Structure formats: C-alpha cells, structure tokens
Amino acid sequence: MKKNHISLGGAMQYKKLFTIPFIALSLFSTACAVQSGNVVGKESVYPPVANFSFEIKIKPLSDMDYQAIITNKKTKKIQIIESMSHPPLTADNLVQIQDLNNDGYPDIILKGFPVAASAINGNELYMFNPETKQFEETKDITQLGEIHASGKNCIYVDYRKNSMEYSQDHYCWRNGKWHFIENR
C-alpha cells in the first residue's frame, strides 16, 4: 500500500515565494505611510512660537480627518477642533499662527481640503477671544479659500469663483469683526 504524502519542501518553498514579497510590500507601504505623515493616531506638535502660551498638537483620526488639540500651557485647559484635510496630517503642514487683527493675541489658520477642484485650500480661521481664552471660528468671512495677511489688520481670501476664474475678497478688522472691503 502506497502512502500519500505531501512534500513539505515544496510547500515551504511556495510559502517563501509568497511570504517574502508580501513582507516587502507591507514594509514598503508602511514606509510610504510614515513618509507622507499618514499614520492614524500619530500626533505631531506645532513648532514652538516665541511667547505663545499654547501648545498645538495635530492628531490624525483617519486619512483625512484630524483633531487640533490646543492646550493652554498656563491653565492646562484643552480645546479640541476637528477638521479635514489631505495628507500629510502634520502640525507643520496644517497650522499657521499669526496675529491677523493686531490685537496682541495669536490667531490660528487651519488648512482644509482644496476647494472646488482647485489648487486653493479651504482654510478655517480661529481668532483668539481673550475673554473666554479660547479660539473661535470667525463667521465674518463668506468665502472658503486660502487666507493671507495683507497689511495691518487686513487679510484677503483667495478662492475659486467659478470653473474659469479665481478671485480675492479683502477684509479688514474693525470693531471686533472682519469687514468686507472689496473683491478683486
């Protein structure tokens, strides 16, 4: 009687042929994810700013959702802002700190997704409120686009007007809010 047997050498050889490329592919995709900053759960801290009494950490929640965790260094009070953007979801890519209204307090611009299939990102502007000691999203800016400083107490927002044209709305800070000045 002839016994059936499986050649372990052949099975092991097949396993090696399958396993080695699988491991190589896994390492490659992990390296790409780390290089792009697209590792869910890995926090990054915004670079220190002189006399800035807050620490800002970016915590990716998925490949496009993130939390900006803002900690007051003095009171240890935490504020969390959730937003969306494209990778890399790192603090140095998503956060800008600037005193846009020249009130002596820092303001935060968070970068979002490109708007209307364009190269312009939809930024969110958070102004520091000294009474609440929190950053509050401004409601005075009507267009979603990239926000830039343009002189003392003024900003402009680049945005896509339609499928062919881009535009800029200019605002200046007066009496505690942003006032529309002109469109260019």
Report residues per predicted region.
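Acidic, small-residue rich beta-repeat scaffolds with periodic aromatic anchors
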Residues: 9-10, 16-22, 30-64, 147-184
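Acidic carboxylate motifs that coordinate Ca2+ or other divalent cations, activating on Asp/Glu
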Residues: 103
